[in-house]
Amino acid sequence: METITISEVPKHVGETVKIGVWLTDKRSSGKIAFLQLRDGTGFFQGIIRKNDVSEEKFDSAKHDLHQETSFWVTGEIAEDKRSKFGYEIHIKDFDIVGESEDYPIGNKEHGIDFLLDNRHLWLRSRKPWALMRIRSRVKLATMEFFEKHGFTQFDAPELTGSAPEGTTELFETDYFDRSAFLSQSGQLYAEAGAMALGRVYTMGPTFRAEKSKTRRHLMEFWMIEPEMAWMHQDESLKIQEQYIAYLVQDLIDHCARELEMVGRSVESLKPFTELPYPRITYKEAIEILQKGGFDVEYGADFGSPEETYLADQFQKPVFILNYPKEIKAFYMPEDPEDSRQVICADLLAPEGYGEIIGGSERSYDYEYITNKLEENGLSKEDYGWYDDLRKYGSIPHSGFGMGLERFLAWITLQDHIRETIPFPRMLNRLNP
Protein backbone atom coordinates (compact mmCIF):
# COMPACT_ATOMS: atom_id res chain seq x y z
CA MET A 1 0.00 0.00 0.00
CA GLU A 2 1.39 3.38 -1.04
CA THR A 3 1.60 6.47 1.17
CA ILE A 4 0.61 9.55 -0.86
CA THR A 5 -0.38 13.20 -0.48
CA ILE A 6 -3.73 14.77 -1.31
CA SER A 7 -2.19 16.45 -4.36
CA GLU A 8 -1.39 12.98 -5.74
CA VAL A 9 -4.93 11.63 -5.24
CA PRO A 10 -6.04 11.95 -8.92
CA LYS A 11 -3.34 9.44 -9.94
CA HIS A 12 -4.61 6.78 -7.52
CA VAL A 13 -8.34 6.41 -8.25
CA GLY A 14 -9.48 2.90 -7.33
CA GLU A 15 -6.41 2.21 -5.21
CA THR A 16 -6.12 1.75 -1.46
CA VAL A 17 -3.67 4.31 -0.06
CA LYS A 18 -2.46 5.87 3.18
CA ILE A 19 -2.43 9.65 3.80
CA GLY A 20 -1.35 11.74 6.80
CA VAL A 21 -4.04 14.39 7.38
CA TRP A 22 -5.55 16.96 9.72
CA LEU A 23 -9.29 17.30 10.26
CA THR A 24 -10.74 20.69 9.34
CA ASP A 25 -14.43 19.88 9.86
CA LYS A 26 -16.85 16.96 10.08
CA ARG A 27 -20.53 16.08 10.10
CA SER A 28 -22.36 12.82 10.80
CA SER A 29 -25.61 11.45 9.47
CA GLY A 30 -26.71 8.13 10.94
CA LYS A 31 -24.37 5.43 9.70
CA ILE A 32 -22.03 7.73 7.77
CA ALA A 33 -19.54 10.44 8.74
CA PHE A 34 -18.12 13.06 6.39
CA LEU A 35 -14.63 14.33 7.23
CA GLN A 36 -13.05 17.43 5.69
CA LEU A 37 -9.32 16.75 5.46
CA ARG A 38 -6.12 18.62 4.62
CA ASP A 39 -2.47 17.63 4.47
CA GLY A 40 -0.60 20.77 3.39
CA THR A 41 -0.79 19.95 -0.32
CA GLY A 42 -4.56 20.28 -0.59
CA PHE A 43 -8.02 19.61 0.77
CA PHE A 44 -10.54 16.86 0.16
CA GLN A 45 -13.23 14.74 1.79
CA GLY A 46 -13.10 11.44 3.63
CA ILE A 47 -16.17 9.25 4.13
CA ILE A 48 -16.53 6.67 6.89
CA ARG A 49 -19.42 4.22 6.66
CA LYS A 50 -20.33 2.26 9.76
CA ASN A 51 -20.28 -1.01 7.83
CA ASP A 52 -16.70 -0.39 6.60
CA VAL A 53 -15.01 -0.07 10.02
CA SER A 54 -15.35 -1.54 13.46
CA GLU A 55 -17.97 -0.11 15.79
CA GLU A 56 -15.16 1.20 17.99
CA LYS A 57 -13.55 3.05 15.06
CA PHE A 58 -16.84 4.54 13.94
CA ASP A 59 -17.57 5.83 17.44
CA SER A 60 -14.02 7.20 17.63
CA ALA A 61 -14.53 9.07 14.35
CA LYS A 62 -17.66 10.68 15.78
CA HIS A 63 -16.29 11.51 19.24
CA ASP A 64 -12.46 11.60 19.16
CA LEU A 65 -11.72 13.40 15.91
CA HIS A 66 -11.78 17.14 16.62
CA GLN A 67 -10.77 20.10 14.47
CA GLU A 68 -7.02 19.87 13.71
CA THR A 69 -6.66 16.35 15.09
CA SER A 70 -3.87 14.72 13.06
CA PHE A 71 -4.14 11.11 11.95
CA TRP A 72 -3.21 8.53 9.37
CA VAL A 73 -6.10 7.53 7.17
CA THR A 74 -6.28 4.40 5.01
CA GLY A 75 -8.88 3.89 2.31
CA GLU A 76 -9.81 3.70 -1.35
CA ILE A 77 -9.68 6.77 -3.59
CA ALA A 78 -12.85 7.45 -5.57
CA GLU A 79 -13.67 10.13 -8.12
CA ASP A 80 -16.74 12.23 -7.29
CA LYS A 81 -17.60 14.89 -9.86
CA ARG A 82 -20.34 16.26 -7.61
CA SER A 83 -17.82 17.14 -4.92
CA LYS A 84 -16.03 20.51 -5.03
CA PHE A 85 -12.81 18.55 -4.51
CA GLY A 86 -13.47 16.08 -7.34
CA TYR A 87 -12.20 13.14 -5.28
CA GLU A 88 -12.77 11.53 -1.90
CA ILE A 89 -11.38 8.69 0.17
CA HIS A 90 -13.59 5.88 1.43
CA ILE A 91 -11.98 5.28 4.79
CA LYS A 92 -11.32 1.74 5.98
CA ASP A 93 -9.13 2.60 8.96
CA PHE A 94 -7.46 5.51 10.74
CA ASP A 95 -4.92 6.02 13.53
CA ILE A 96 -4.81 9.20 15.59
CA VAL A 97 -1.35 10.80 15.84
CA GLY A 98 -2.00 14.11 17.62
CA GLU A 99 -5.03 15.12 19.69
CA SER A 100 -6.53 18.58 19.27
CA GLU A 101 -8.89 19.66 22.03
CA ASP A 102 -10.48 23.12 22.01
CA TYR A 103 -8.81 24.42 18.85
CA PRO A 104 -9.18 28.21 19.18
CA ILE A 105 -10.05 29.05 15.57
CA GLY A 106 -13.49 27.73 14.77
CA ASN A 107 -15.65 28.04 11.69
CA LYS A 108 -17.30 31.22 13.00
CA GLU A 109 -16.15 34.77 12.23
CA HIS A 110 -13.17 35.99 14.29
CA GLY A 111 -11.78 39.51 14.71
CA ILE A 112 -8.53 40.42 12.98
CA ASP A 113 -6.60 40.97 16.23
CA PHE A 114 -7.59 37.51 17.47
CA LEU A 115 -6.53 35.96 14.18
CA LEU A 116 -3.20 37.80 14.20
CA ASP A 117 -2.59 36.71 17.81
CA ASN A 118 -3.11 33.17 16.55
CA ARG A 119 -1.36 33.62 13.21
CA HIS A 120 0.69 30.46 13.83
CA LEU A 121 -2.58 28.51 13.72
CA TRP A 122 -4.51 30.73 11.31
CA LEU A 123 -2.01 29.80 8.58
CA ARG A 124 -3.68 26.36 8.49
CA SER A 125 -6.97 27.86 7.26
CA ARG A 126 -7.90 27.77 3.60
CA LYS A 127 -7.37 31.43 2.69
CA PRO A 128 -3.93 31.88 4.34
CA TRP A 129 -2.92 28.49 2.94
CA ALA A 130 -3.81 29.63 -0.58
CA LEU A 131 -2.03 32.97 -0.14
CA MET A 132 1.18 31.31 1.02
CA ARG A 133 1.06 28.93 -1.95
CA ILE A 134 0.66 31.90 -4.31
CA ARG A 135 3.50 33.74 -2.58
CA SER A 136 5.78 30.73 -3.00
CA ARG A 137 4.88 30.44 -6.68
CA VAL A 138 5.63 34.13 -7.32
CA LYS A 139 9.10 33.73 -5.83
CA LEU A 140 9.74 30.66 -7.98
CA ALA A 141 8.45 32.42 -11.11
CA THR A 142 10.66 35.41 -10.29
CA MET A 143 13.74 33.19 -10.32
CA GLU A 144 12.62 31.54 -13.55
CA PHE A 145 11.97 34.87 -15.29
CA PHE A 146 15.31 36.43 -14.42
CA GLU A 147 17.19 33.23 -15.22
CA LYS A 148 15.61 33.26 -18.69
CA HIS A 149 16.62 36.89 -19.18
CA GLY A 150 20.28 36.43 -18.30
CA PHE A 151 20.25 37.69 -14.71
CA THR A 152 22.36 36.38 -11.83
CA GLN A 153 20.83 36.23 -8.37
CA PHE A 154 22.86 38.46 -6.07
CA ASP A 155 22.72 38.61 -2.27
CA ALA A 156 22.87 42.05 -0.67
CA PRO A 157 23.67 42.40 3.06
CA GLU A 158 20.84 42.89 5.55
CA LEU A 159 23.11 44.78 7.96
CA THR A 160 24.63 48.10 6.93
CA GLY A 161 26.98 50.42 8.75
CA SER A 162 25.57 53.73 7.59
CA ALA A 163 22.41 55.78 8.00
CA PRO A 164 21.45 58.74 5.78
CA GLU A 165 21.45 62.03 7.68
CA GLY A 166 18.06 62.91 9.12
CA THR A 167 16.38 59.59 8.44
CA THR A 168 14.10 58.17 11.14
CA GLU A 169 13.04 55.03 9.30
CA LEU A 170 15.99 52.75 10.05
CA PHE A 171 16.08 50.02 12.67
CA GLU A 172 19.31 50.39 14.65
CA THR A 173 21.11 47.61 16.51
CA ASP A 174 24.42 47.18 18.34
CA TYR A 175 27.25 45.82 16.22
CA PHE A 176 30.11 45.14 18.63
CA ASP A 177 31.67 48.61 19.18
CA ARG A 178 29.43 50.54 16.80
CA SER A 179 25.88 50.76 15.45
CA ALA A 180 24.46 48.84 12.53
CA PHE A 181 21.19 49.25 10.69
CA LEU A 182 18.76 46.83 9.10
CA SER A 183 18.73 47.35 5.36
CA GLN A 184 15.98 49.35 3.67
CA SER A 185 17.06 48.24 0.21
CA GLY A 186 19.64 46.11 -1.54
CA GLN A 187 19.81 48.46 -4.51
CA LEU A 188 23.17 50.16 -3.95
CA TYR A 189 24.87 46.80 -3.44
CA ALA A 190 23.06 45.38 -6.48
CA GLU A 191 24.54 48.22 -8.54
CA ALA A 192 27.98 46.98 -7.53
CA GLY A 193 26.86 43.50 -8.53
CA ALA A 194 25.74 44.73 -11.94
CA MET A 195 29.19 46.23 -12.57
CA ALA A 196 30.63 42.74 -12.03
CA LEU A 197 27.93 40.45 -13.44
CA GLY A 198 25.98 42.59 -15.94
CA ARG A 199 22.42 41.82 -14.89
CA VAL A 200 21.61 40.92 -11.30
CA TYR A 201 18.63 40.82 -8.98
CA THR A 202 18.24 40.63 -5.24
CA MET A 203 15.29 39.05 -3.44
CA GLY A 204 14.94 39.30 0.29
CA PRO A 205 13.55 41.11 3.33
CA THR A 206 13.89 44.83 3.92
CA PHE A 207 13.04 46.88 6.98
CA ARG A 208 11.45 50.30 7.50
CA ALA A 209 10.87 51.83 10.93
CA GLU A 210 7.97 53.75 9.44
CA LYS A 211 5.28 54.64 11.97
CA SER A 212 2.45 53.96 9.57
CA LYS A 213 -0.72 51.93 10.04
CA THR A 214 -1.99 52.00 6.46
CA ARG A 215 -3.04 48.89 4.59
CA ARG A 216 0.01 49.24 2.33
CA HIS A 217 2.76 49.29 4.96
CA LEU A 218 4.70 46.71 6.96
CA MET A 219 7.86 47.10 9.05
CA GLU A 220 9.38 44.04 7.36
CA PHE A 221 8.64 43.18 3.74
CA TRP A 222 10.31 41.56 0.76
CA MET A 223 11.75 43.36 -2.25
CA ILE A 224 12.81 42.10 -5.66
CA GLU A 225 15.45 44.53 -6.95
CA PRO A 226 17.06 44.01 -10.37
CA GLU A 227 19.96 46.14 -11.63
CA MET A 228 21.01 46.11 -15.27
CA ALA A 229 24.29 47.29 -16.80
CA TRP A 230 24.27 49.07 -20.16
CA MET A 231 20.52 49.68 -19.97
CA HIS A 232 18.49 52.87 -20.33
CA GLN A 233 14.97 53.52 -19.09
CA ASP A 234 13.05 52.34 -22.15
CA GLU A 235 14.73 48.94 -22.03
CA SER A 236 14.19 48.75 -18.28
CA LEU A 237 10.46 49.46 -18.63
CA LYS A 238 10.17 46.61 -21.12
CA ILE A 239 11.82 44.25 -18.63
CA GLN A 240 9.48 45.47 -15.88
CA GLU A 241 6.26 44.93 -17.81
CA GLN A 242 7.45 41.58 -19.14
CA TYR A 243 8.22 40.54 -15.57
CA ILE A 244 4.77 41.47 -14.25
CA ALA A 245 3.00 39.83 -17.20
CA TYR A 246 5.13 36.70 -16.70
CA LEU A 247 4.19 36.48 -13.02
CA VAL A 248 0.49 36.92 -13.76
CA GLN A 249 0.50 34.29 -16.52
CA ASP A 250 2.44 31.88 -14.33
CA LEU A 251 -0.17 32.20 -11.57
CA ILE A 252 -2.96 31.65 -14.09
CA ASP A 253 -1.18 28.48 -15.23
CA HIS A 254 -0.19 27.08 -11.84
CA CYS A 255 -2.39 28.60 -9.11
CA ALA A 256 -5.92 28.82 -10.54
CA ARG A 257 -7.28 26.81 -7.59
CA GLU A 258 -5.57 29.02 -5.01
CA LEU A 259 -6.66 32.21 -6.79
CA GLU A 260 -10.25 31.01 -6.72
CA MET A 261 -9.95 30.30 -2.99
CA VAL A 262 -8.97 33.92 -2.28
CA GLY A 263 -11.65 35.39 -4.53
CA ARG A 264 -9.65 36.32 -7.65
CA SER A 265 -10.95 35.00 -10.96
CA VAL A 266 -8.44 33.91 -13.56
CA GLU A 267 -10.39 35.77 -16.25
CA SER A 268 -9.95 39.08 -14.44
CA LEU A 269 -6.16 38.63 -14.53
CA LYS A 270 -5.80 37.96 -18.25
CA PRO A 271 -5.82 41.65 -19.34
CA PHE A 272 -2.73 42.20 -17.18
CA THR A 273 -0.74 39.84 -19.41
CA GLU A 274 -1.34 42.03 -22.48
CA LEU A 275 1.63 44.26 -23.34
CA PRO A 276 2.74 46.96 -23.58
CA TYR A 277 1.40 48.75 -20.52
CA PRO A 278 0.37 52.40 -20.97
CA ARG A 279 2.97 55.09 -20.27
CA ILE A 280 2.30 58.69 -19.30
CA THR A 281 4.62 61.40 -18.00
CA TYR A 282 4.36 62.93 -14.56
CA LYS A 283 3.23 66.17 -16.22
CA GLU A 284 0.44 64.33 -18.04
CA ALA A 285 -0.54 62.66 -14.77
CA ILE A 286 -0.89 66.08 -13.12
CA GLU A 287 -3.17 67.21 -15.96
CA ILE A 288 -5.33 64.08 -15.65
CA LEU A 289 -5.67 64.61 -11.91
CA GLN A 290 -6.52 68.28 -12.27
CA LYS A 291 -9.22 67.46 -14.82
CA GLY A 292 -10.51 64.85 -12.37
CA GLY A 293 -10.96 67.47 -9.67
CA PHE A 294 -7.78 66.88 -7.65
CA ASP A 295 -6.08 69.90 -6.09
CA VAL A 296 -2.53 69.10 -7.20
CA GLU A 297 0.25 71.14 -8.75
CA TYR A 298 3.56 70.28 -10.37
CA GLY A 299 5.94 69.10 -7.68
CA ALA A 300 3.38 67.19 -5.64
CA ASP A 301 3.99 63.57 -4.75
CA PHE A 302 1.08 61.19 -5.31
CA GLY A 303 -0.73 59.46 -2.48
CA SER A 304 -3.11 56.53 -2.61
CA PRO A 305 -6.15 58.52 -3.91
CA GLU A 306 -4.14 60.00 -6.79
CA GLU A 307 -2.53 56.69 -7.73
CA THR A 308 -5.88 54.92 -7.63
CA TYR A 309 -7.50 57.52 -9.87
CA LEU A 310 -4.66 57.44 -12.41
CA ALA A 311 -4.62 53.64 -12.68
CA ASP A 312 -8.42 53.56 -12.95
CA GLN A 313 -8.19 55.59 -16.16
CA PHE A 314 -6.43 52.67 -17.83
CA GLN A 315 -7.82 49.58 -16.02
CA LYS A 316 -4.39 47.96 -16.16
CA PRO A 317 -0.89 48.72 -14.86
CA VAL A 318 0.37 52.12 -16.01
CA PHE A 319 3.84 53.69 -15.91
CA ILE A 320 4.24 57.27 -14.67
CA LEU A 321 7.50 58.68 -16.08
CA ASN A 322 9.98 61.31 -14.90
CA TYR A 323 8.98 62.80 -11.55
CA PRO A 324 10.38 66.05 -10.11
CA LYS A 325 13.82 65.45 -8.63
CA GLU A 326 12.84 66.91 -5.24
CA ILE A 327 10.61 63.91 -4.52
CA LYS A 328 12.95 61.22 -5.83
CA ALA A 329 16.26 59.67 -4.76
CA PHE A 330 19.69 61.27 -5.12
CA TYR A 331 21.10 58.67 -7.54
CA MET A 332 18.58 59.36 -10.33
CA PRO A 333 19.97 61.40 -13.27
CA GLU A 334 18.40 64.60 -14.49
CA ASP A 335 16.06 64.46 -17.46
CA PRO A 336 17.95 66.12 -20.36
CA GLU A 337 14.65 67.54 -21.64
CA ASP A 338 13.70 69.12 -18.29
CA SER A 339 16.30 69.62 -15.57
CA ARG A 340 13.54 69.85 -12.94
CA GLN A 341 12.92 66.13 -13.41
CA VAL A 342 14.81 62.86 -13.16
CA ILE A 343 14.69 59.80 -15.42
CA CYS A 344 12.52 57.42 -13.44
CA ALA A 345 9.19 55.61 -13.49
CA ASP A 346 6.65 54.16 -11.09
CA LEU A 347 4.32 51.34 -12.11
CA LEU A 348 0.83 51.73 -10.66
CA ALA A 349 -1.44 48.72 -10.32
CA PRO A 350 -5.18 49.12 -11.01
CA GLU A 351 -8.07 48.25 -8.69
CA GLY A 352 -6.91 50.64 -5.97
CA TYR A 353 -3.50 49.11 -5.21
CA GLY A 354 -1.20 51.90 -6.39
CA GLU A 355 2.56 51.70 -6.81
CA ILE A 356 4.04 48.21 -7.05
CA ILE A 357 7.33 49.09 -8.80
CA GLY A 358 9.65 52.05 -8.55
CA GLY A 359 12.61 52.32 -10.90
CA SER A 360 15.01 54.67 -12.63
CA GLU A 361 18.17 55.09 -14.56
CA ARG A 362 21.09 55.44 -12.16
CA SER A 363 23.40 58.40 -12.71
CA TYR A 364 26.83 57.22 -13.82
CA ASP A 365 28.46 60.66 -13.59
CA TYR A 366 31.11 60.67 -10.85
CA GLU A 367 30.92 64.41 -10.13
CA TYR A 368 27.10 64.38 -10.08
CA ILE A 369 26.94 61.52 -7.57
CA THR A 370 29.71 63.04 -5.44
CA ASN A 371 27.78 66.30 -5.20
CA LYS A 372 24.50 64.50 -4.49
CA LEU A 373 26.09 62.56 -1.65
CA GLU A 374 27.25 65.83 -0.09
CA GLU A 375 23.86 67.50 -0.60
CA ASN A 376 22.11 64.61 1.14
CA GLY A 377 24.50 64.45 4.07
CA LEU A 378 25.93 61.08 3.06
CA SER A 379 29.52 60.83 4.20
CA LYS A 380 32.41 59.78 1.99
CA GLU A 381 33.42 57.34 4.72
CA ASP A 382 30.11 55.48 4.45
CA TYR A 383 29.37 55.90 0.75
CA GLY A 384 32.79 56.25 -0.86
CA TRP A 385 32.47 52.70 -2.17
CA TYR A 386 29.26 53.70 -4.00
CA ASP A 387 31.05 56.70 -5.48
CA ASP A 388 33.81 54.35 -6.67
CA LEU A 389 31.32 52.64 -8.99
CA ARG A 390 31.35 55.88 -11.04
CA LYS A 391 35.10 56.35 -10.73
CA TYR A 392 36.22 53.09 -12.30
CA GLY A 393 34.66 52.29 -15.68
CA SER A 394 31.27 53.90 -15.13
CA ILE A 395 28.50 52.96 -17.56
CA PRO A 396 24.78 53.65 -18.12
CA HIS A 397 22.66 51.37 -15.96
CA SER A 398 19.12 51.10 -14.65
CA GLY A 399 17.20 49.25 -12.00
CA PHE A 400 13.90 48.88 -10.21
CA GLY A 401 12.34 47.46 -7.09
CA MET A 402 9.07 45.57 -6.65
CA GLY A 403 7.45 45.11 -3.27
CA LEU A 404 6.45 41.44 -3.12
CA GLU A 405 3.61 41.95 -0.65
CA ARG A 406 2.14 44.87 -2.61
CA PHE A 407 2.16 42.81 -5.78
CA LEU A 408 0.53 39.89 -3.98
CA ALA A 409 -2.12 42.08 -2.36
CA TRP A 410 -3.12 43.35 -5.80
CA ILE A 411 -3.12 39.97 -7.51
CA THR A 412 -5.12 38.34 -4.70
CA LEU A 413 -7.39 41.34 -4.02
CA GLN A 414 -6.45 41.62 -0.34
CA ASP A 415 -7.56 44.63 1.68
CA HIS A 416 -4.29 44.69 3.65
CA ILE A 417 -0.82 43.49 2.70
CA ARG A 418 -0.44 41.79 6.10
CA GLU A 419 -2.42 38.89 4.61
CA THR A 420 0.33 38.14 2.10
CA ILE A 421 3.26 37.44 4.44
CA PRO A 422 3.40 34.53 6.90
CA PHE A 423 4.07 36.55 10.05
CA PRO A 424 3.44 40.29 9.48
CA ARG A 425 5.49 42.83 11.39
CA MET A 426 3.50 46.00 11.96
CA LEU A 427 3.71 49.07 14.17
CA ASN A 428 1.87 47.37 17.03
CA ARG A 429 2.74 43.75 16.32
CA LEU A 430 5.98 41.81 16.77
CA ASN A 431 4.56 38.43 17.81
CA PRO A 432 4.04 35.62 16.99
Swiss-Prot record:
EC nos: 6.1.1.22
Domain of life: Bacteria
Keywords on record: Aminoacyl-tRNA synthetase, ATP-binding, Cytoplasm, Ligase, Nucleotide-binding, Protein biosynthesis
InterPro entries per the UniProt record, alphabetical: Aa-tRNA-synt_II (IPR004364), aa-tRNA-synth_II (IPR006195), aa-tRNA-synth_II/BPL/LPL (IPR045864), Asn-tRNA-ligase (IPR004522), Asp/Asn-tRNA-synth_IIb (IPR002312), NA-bd_OB-fold (IPR012340), NA-bd_OB_tRNA (IPR004365)
Catalytic reactions on record: tRNA(Asn) + L-asparagine + ATP = L-asparaginyl-tRNA(Asn) + AMP + diphosphate + H(+)
Molecular function GO terms recorded: asparagine-tRNA ligase activity; ATP binding; catalytic activity, acting on a protein; nucleic acid binding; transferase activity
Annotated localization: Cytoplasm
A Gene Ontology BP annotation from the UniProt entry: asparaginyl-tRNA aminoacylation
EC top class, as a word: ligase
Example of a GO cellular component annotation carried by this entry: cytoplasm
Subunit structure: Homodimer.
Entry's family note: Belongs to the class-II aminoacyl-tRNA synthetase family.
The protein's name: Asparagine--tRNA ligase
